[in-house]
Swiss-Prot record:
S-adenosyl-L-methionine binds at A33, G34, H35, D53, F80, D101, Q108. Signal peptide: none annotated. It holds the Pfam family Methyltransf_5. It comes from Desulforamulus reducens (strain ATCC BAA-1160 / DSM 100696 / MI-1) (Desulfotomaculum reducens). It is an enzyme of class 2 (transferase). Keywords: Cytoplasm, Methyltransferase, rRNA processing, S-adenosyl-L-methionine, Transferase. Its EC number is 2.1.1.199. It is found in: Cytoplasm. Belongs to the methyltransferase superfamily. RsmH family. GO terms for biological process: rRNA base methylation. It catalyses: cytidine(1402) in 16S rRNA + S-adenosyl-L-methionine = N(4)-methylcytidine(1402) in 16S rRNA + S-adenosyl-L-homocysteine + H(+). This is Ribosomal RNA small subunit methyltransferase H. Specifically methylates the N4 position of cytidine in position 1402 (C1402) of 16S rRNA.
Length: 313
């Protein structure tokens, strides 16, 4: 299957990096390589880009799509939470800009055998890379009802989490749940008819929650952002695109902490803790897709872009 993916907030996110022709940049979520291609087009012959993705299909796609930049593009098949280690191994001490696009690629969603989508019946999987050992199928069939409800409530923010978990456990006692279609049917049965008539697909939040749990997405996000900011040169920029409120809240709070790290009581006339701001926040409010973009790519509707700049410290 061809690796198809429409890059979200493409120009806004790359404009936010303020590309320097001879700079070094990192695309931490290579995906369909659309953002990487735009960065490389703006770089001069001395500029370099490191592309990180744990999905072998994304790495293979990028190798083909970006082959016109052989000396400038370097692909790394790893999880982006290892950015500090990756740059150290490449003998790169500082970079000019870093991009994160935290959405699941259209390719992953539209490839049934990856088991990400509630729109295609396939084996339950949801692992983004070979390093993940536990699949969604194992979570759904093996963990307790309480743990399942916690995952759906915490990562999916689904009001019916407890009821969905109860229905899943009831069904798996009869037979194991193997496919996305089987899970969708259980969720539809669990969610009351009235609630199903409104809002998104009833399985959307549960599938999101399982994907986040399988890939440990949120647990590593805050520290990854801090490591990324540490890797930036003074004046370097970081652009982060999120697709749901949990991710956006983590990025927002981490940026706020890095921009104002002082822990002194409000009554103190001057700072005594000695903690210095590391960044300035460029986007007071997140940038969202235009109407034109949403017409061409409805999947972009929940995207939010936040940008920050490293201070001279």
């Amino acid at each position: 299957m061809e690796f198809k993916h429409v890059s979200v907030l493409l120009h806004e996110s790359i404009d936010g990096l303020k590309i320097k022709p001879g700079g070094i940049y990192v695309d931490c979520t290579l995906g369909g390589a659309g953002h990487s291609l735009e960065i490389l087009r703006r770089l001069g012959p001395e500029g370099k880009l490191v592309g990180i993705d744990q999905d072998p299909a994304a790495i293979a796609n990028a190798a083909e799509k970006l082959q016109e930049f052989p000396g400038q593009f370097h692909a790394v098949q790893r999880n982006f939470f290892q950015i500090k280690q990756i740059l150290r191994e490449m003998a790169i001490s500082e970079v000019d800009g870093i991009l994160f696009d935290l959405g699941v690629s259209s390719y992953q969603l539209d490839t049934p055998e990856r088991g990400f989508s509630y729109m295609h019946d396939a084996e339950l999987d949801m692992r983004m890379g070979p390093d993940q050992t536990i699949s969604a199928k194992e979570l759904v069939n093996d963990i307790s009802e309480e743990e399942l409800a916690t995952i759906i409530r915490r990562y999916g923010e689904d009001r019916w989490a407890k009821r969905i978990a109860s229905f899943i456990v009831k069904e798996r006692k009869k037979r194991a749940i193997h496919t996305t279609g089987e899970l969708v049917d259980i969720i539809k049965a669990a969610v009351p008819v009235g609630a199903r008539r409104e809002g998104p697909h009833p399985a959307k939040r549960t599938f999101q929650a399982l994907r986040i749990a399988v890939n440990n997405e949120l647990e590593i996000l805050e520290q990854t952002m801090k490591d990324a900011v540490t890797a930036l040169k003074s004046g370097g920029r970081i652009s982060v695109i999120t697709f749901h409120s949990l991710e956006d809240r983590i990025i927002k709070d981490t940026f706020k902490e890095l921009a104002n790290p002082c822990t002194c009581p409000p009554a103190f006339p001057v700072c005594a803790c000695g903690k210095q701001p590391q960044i300035k926040i460029v986007t007071g409010k997140p940038i969202q897709p235009s109407k034109e973009e949403l017409e061409h790519n409805p999947r972009a509707r929940s995207a939010k872009l936040r940008i920050a700049e490293k201070l001279n410290i």
